[in-house]
């Protein structure tokens, strides 16, 4: 996810379809590519309106689409058009969902919009590592006091989500981001579902071994 960015573009990160540095998206100027995932690209950018660095996530399912005209995307095969549009709707839905909430341990969406046959999400530029990465660097189990501090922030974020009738459904060490400065941030609402709108509809199973709730295995 885009939130896992550092303060500078990651060395060695590149992609043939990435927007080059200097590209303008509205008031934002792309400075470099931070990361590439299966469904999106994350850029470091500069907001010329508010004069601050931000992270921009672009909907880019690399298996389905590529860059065709300047900043625009094109679906590689007509048979993938429906899947591409469904993913785009999901991306925009996630942005709208995140924009509803305001909590220091939830990703804040400053702005999102659709253009160029894709969509963009503007967020803070976080610096740090995931809980999973931090644990891998530890030679011994982390102290209980440290764990409690991390979990307290995560539980606070979940409380806000649950009050908003929203389920995260993908809590795991790689979705908890430990900032260099600031509280832990809960990542990846791509698996989230709005509880009210989903009543009577089938959830898409999102399972993570050792972390998925047991009731998901029967869905």
Q: Which residues does each PLM region occupy?
A:
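Conserved short submotifs of the Hanks-type protein kinase catalytic core
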Residues: 116-130
